[in-house]
Amino acid sequence: MKPSEIREMSIEEIDAKIRELRLQLAKERGMLTMGTSLENPMVIRNLRRDIARLLTIKKEKLREMGKK
């Protein structure tokens, strides 16, 4: 997910996307702990980075709203 795409989203949409990605991350980690090999081991890393990106841009937006 690109930062420009995230910046176009509203805060509510960002929150929904964060919940969705965290759920997907929990499922992937669960599969890993059960011994199932992942199709693409980079999935977990990419999910974590997407969540961090979403949280960062959400904080930026909230800061902007506070200044206005």
UniProtKB/Swiss-Prot annotation:
Pfam families: Ribosomal_L29 (PF00831). SUPFAM superfamilies: Ribosomal protein L29 (L29p) (SSF46561). Gene3D superfamilies: 1.10.287.310. InterPro entries: Ribosomal_uL29 (IPR001854), Ribosomal_uL29_CS (IPR018254), Ribosomal_uL29_sf (IPR036049). The keyword Zinc does not apply. GO terms for molecular function: structural constituent of ribosome. GO terms for cellular component: ribonucleoprotein complex; ribosome. GO terms for biological process: translation. Keywords: Ribonucleoprotein, Ribosomal protein. PROSITE patterns: RIBOSOMAL_L29. The keyword Acyltransferase does not apply. Belongs to the universal ribosomal protein uL29 family. This is Large ribosomal subunit protein uL29. It comes from Pyrococcus horikoshii (strain ATCC 700860 / DSM 12428 / JCM 9974 / NBRC 100139 / OT-3).
